[in-house]
């Protein structure tokens, strides 16, 4: 049974609409979290979604090698994340989330700044490693802070609120980023220089967020941690908790939900970019067309996030995960039946994918947040993020081969099947470890 049930009568300080916030968390802390959420996913996902222009206009990579190179970069990116993310989560239990969240945005900004300066694939890979350490820290800290601030009865709604800002940021900032190369070209710069200046603009956004985070987030280690245990002991909390069926399920869900995000950011815009190029579009027009559907995915997630958050707080988190896996599996598998990737059918598929993407990530995060022990939550969420990195690694390595050598929709079918597998696991856990508070 669930081992970390908290009472719905838990004391709270602030109340933001239906969201109850723990005592000691200030309005500035909450606003800073939302500000970081607005920028966080957008600046991280642009690394992949904006890559076709780097490959083609900066490095001169042949378009039939885009899938291989994208998969290679994501593969090694996730190796770094796997190495770093559990220690980062454990370290945050000892020194607090704030310095590690600031460092995350600094490294992400440096990665974006260096990326268009690469002269070959090896340099591009090196710069990607810097970025990878930043994303490892950002992913773990966003999840940890979003779980630290609310009372249990508002956990899913709080995570939904951060994902709402994620989605708004994705829609607004991705729309801005996709137009920046054209804006710079209209100002008289060539394509390569425009791509470079676009990346540097994204980099500047990251540095602003880093400054905001160090000033605005709650200081110190989480209040639940009363004494500092050895680092290895803290990391072991994340491993030992996997003996509990619901936490083990959340780790499996992390593999799939983060894989869902990876397949979108790594292959979705690249697929649509290549479809546009096959039809004779210019590189910037093809990139813009791909981003249009990417924005629709995020807009759908934006609409769905509040509804899903409220729904999850009113049901067993495992049942919520089952519903999410149905939506996500249907969304990704539907791409196999889209006749024209740039046509009307794709609008409907993009909306379904958006619903599934946000449901999968929100349900898995709220499940691990509820089941993790208050002391050591950072370590458990760090382990959750590590399993998420494994999912991204699998999507990058297998998906890259499928994309280039089998079919451009291969990676999407792969993650669709993975969602169905987790659906089956969730049904089993629901039977063997029911939640008595939602029975």
Question: Where do the model's predicted regions map?
Answer:
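Central cavity-lining transmembrane alpha-helices of secondary-active solute carriers
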Residues: 71-89, 295-307
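Short amphipathic helix-loop junctions that connect adjacent transmembrane helices
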Residues: 50-67, 266-288
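Glycine-rich segments within core transmembrane alpha-helices of 12-TM secondary carriers
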Residues: 159-182, 385-395
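Helix-to-loop junctions at the C-terminal end of transmembrane segments
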Residues: 84-96, 303-317, 403
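C-terminal ends and interior cores of transmembrane alpha-helices
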Residues: 106-119, 326-340
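Intracellular juxtamembrane helix-capping segments at the cytosolic ends
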Residues: 137-151, 359-372
């Amino acid at each position: 049974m669930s081992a970390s049930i908290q009472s719905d009568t838990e004391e709270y300080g602030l109340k933001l609409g239906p969201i109850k916030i723990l005592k000691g968390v200030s309005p500035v802390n909450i606003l800073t979290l939302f500000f970081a959420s607005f920028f966080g996913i957008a600046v991280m996902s642009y690394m992949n979604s904006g890559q076709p222009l780097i490959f083609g206009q900066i490095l001169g990579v042949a378009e039939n090698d885009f899938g291989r190179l994208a998969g290679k970069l994501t593969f090694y990116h996730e190796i770094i994340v796997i190495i770093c993310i559990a220690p980062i989560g454990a370290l945050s239990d000892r020194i607090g989330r704030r310095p590690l969240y600031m460092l995350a945005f600094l490294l992400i900004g440096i990665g974006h700044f260096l990326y268009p300066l690469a002269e070959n694939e090896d340099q591009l890979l090196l710069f990607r490693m810097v970025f990878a350490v930043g994303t490892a820290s950002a992913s773990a800290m966003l999840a940890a802070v979003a779980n630290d601030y609310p009372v249990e009865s508002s956990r899913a709604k709080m995570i939904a609120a951060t994902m709402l800002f994620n989605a708004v940021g994705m829609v607004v900032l991705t729309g801005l980023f996709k137009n920046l190369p054209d804006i710079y070209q209209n100002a008289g710069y060539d394509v390569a220089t425009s791509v470079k200046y676009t990346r540097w603009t994204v980099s500047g956004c990251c540095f602003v967020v880093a400054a905001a985070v160090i000033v605005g987030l709650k200081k110190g280690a989480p209040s639940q941690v009363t004494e500092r245990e050895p680092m290895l002991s803290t990391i072991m909390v994340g491993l030992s908790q996997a003996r509990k069926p619901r936490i083990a399920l959340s780790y499996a869900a992390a593999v799939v939900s983060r894989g869902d995000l990876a397949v979108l950011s790594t292959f979705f815009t690249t697929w649509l970019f290549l479809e546009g190029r096959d039809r004779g579009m210019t590189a910037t027009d093809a990139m813009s067309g791909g981003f249009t559907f990417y924005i629709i995915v995020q807009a759908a997630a934006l609409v769905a996030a509040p509804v899903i958050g409220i729904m999850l707080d009113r049901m067993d988190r495992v049942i919520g995960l089952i519903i999410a896996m149905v939506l996500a599996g249907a969304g990704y598998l539907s791409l196999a039946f889209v006749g024209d990737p740039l046509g009307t059918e794709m609008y409907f598929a993009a909306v379904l994918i958006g619903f599934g993407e946000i449901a999968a990530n929100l349900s898995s995060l709220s499940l691990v947040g509820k089941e993790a022990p208050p002391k050591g939550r950072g370590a458990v969420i760090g382990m959750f993020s590590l399993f998420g990195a494994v999912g991204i690694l699998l999507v990058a390595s297998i998906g890259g081969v499928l994309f280039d050598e089998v079919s451009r929709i291969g990676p999407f079918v792969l993650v669709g099947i993975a969602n169905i597998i987790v659906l089956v696991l969730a049904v089993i856990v629901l039977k063997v470890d029911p939640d008595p508070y939602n029975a």
